[in-house]
Structure formats: C-alpha cells, structure tokens
Design a protein with these regions (language model features):
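N-terminal cationic and glycine-rich segments that engage phosphates or anionic surfaces
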Residues: 1
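Short acidic/His/Gly/Ser-rich catalytic and metal-binding motifs that mark active-site loops
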Residues: 24-25, 103-107, 145-148
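Walker B catalytic acidic pair
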Residues: 100
Length: 230
C-alpha cells in the first residue's frame, strides 16, 4: 500500500515498521515490484531475467520518497515529531503507515490498563492526522476470540484491545482468507477478501482479491475472470 502510494506521488511516505526490520520490508517491496520470488531474493539465487527485473525494481524504489522507521519503543509523540519534519520537507507528507498500533509505546498515564493505553494511542494518531492533514493507516491485531468462532470472518468487535479504535477511525478494513479449497503451492494465488467493516462517509462492502504469496502481491479480480496487480 505504501509502495503504491509512493509510486503515484512525489510526497513523502512515512512507514513505521515496528514488527519487521526495514531491510526485510524493502526486500518484499522489491519482490512485489519486480515480481521476483521472495525465496530467490532471500537466498540471492536469481536467474538472468530476475536480475533485470531486480535492477528495474531498485530503480523504481530509488525514485520514491519512502522513509522507514523500524526502531522499537516509539511513542505517539515521537511519531508525530518525525511526521511533522517530513511534512516540511520536499513536497510534504502524503501518507503515514504504522505496523502495528499495539506495538506503539504509550505514556505511563494508564499503566496497567492496556485497553486505555491503546485508546490513548488511537486518539493521538487521530489528532496527528487532523493536524497534519495526512491520512494515517494503522494496522491492528485482532482478538484471539475470532479463532474460537465457527465463522471466522472479522467484525469490528474483534479489534484487539480496541478501546476507541473503531470510533476514531474513518475506515476500518480487515483481510480475511475464505475457507475454500485451493491448489497447494506458491504459484497459485490464494483468494482473500478485503472487508470494509466501517466507512464513515461511504458504504461497507467486501472486495474479492487474490494474494500471490511468492511475490507478496495482491491482485484485483476482473469480471472477465482475469486478474490485475495492485
């Protein structure tokens, strides 16, 4: 998502990758851009055609304004300070992505109540989005209770330690892998649903996609049974 945004604008894109090292995230971006098997990338065993697409992907990535932050222990105020600086540089700030919300440190104000801590973080991100006039995409964990249900399709109440997340967010979307039989192997894209659970200014709906695991690519499904990369 951050990569797609970066390719379409000259504005700065801030990615706070609090779970995955930036190096690993960049490798996934190269895999997606060049449509190169991520297993080949991780081992360095690329074929001639792979190297060509690798260089093209590097060139595209180098032309974007993506800024990574992968250090742990970051607080909402630190995120805001970094984003404020990016907003004053170049063409300004176009998008903020945080992976994931529950890994952000809160103040000691609500020490002992994780739900209140997450609520404080959620409100701080909402305030930042309004002040800087920038969209903020914050990934969130789901509660383990979803695995105990027969119907595992996510609902709003499944947001882990949700607090005020569902109230603060303009849009809440969840990814869901339908329980269908699919051929085994990385070559076959897996069906996946993007479920819009909340849309403050629009309808909720479910969008059918395909996920190509070996290149970490989502594909939109065309009515004529084709597929195009997103």
């Amino acid at each position: 998502m951050g990569l797609a945004a970066a390719k379409s604008t000259k504005k700065n894109i801030a990615i706070f990758s609090l779970e995955m090292p930036a190096e690993q995230l960049i490798m996934r971006m190269i895999s997606s851009l060049g449509q190169i098997d991520n297993k080949k990338l991780s081992t360095g065993k690329l074929e001639n055609d792979d190297w060509k697409r690798f260089n093209e992907a590097i060139s595209i990535l180098a032309d974007t304004n993506i800024f990574f932050h992968d250090a742990g222990g970051v607080t909402p105020s630190e995120i805001k300070a970094k984003c404020r600086r990016l907003a004053t540089q170049g063409e300004g700030l176009g998008l903020v992505i945080i992976d994931y919300l529950q890994l952000i440190d809160s103040s000691s104000r609500y020490s002992g109540s994780r739900q209140q801590e997450v609520s404080e973080i959620s409100r701080a991100l909402k305030t930042m989005a309004l002040e800087l006039e920038v969209p903020v995409i914050a990934l969130s964990q789901l509660s383990r209770s979803v695995e105990k249900r027969e119907d595992k399709k996510p609902v709003l109440s499944d947001l882990r330690e949700s607090g005020s997340i569902e109230q603060d967010a303009d849009i809440v979307a969840a990814l869901h892998a339908p329980d269908v039989e699919v051929p085994v192997g990385d070559e076959v894209p897996n069906p996946i649903q993007l479920i819009i659970l909340k849309h403050r200014n629009g309808p909720t709906k479910t969008i059918d996609l395909l996920f190509k695991k070996k290149t970490s690519t989502f594909l939109s499904i065309r009515k004529e049974n084709g597929a195009s990369a997103n």
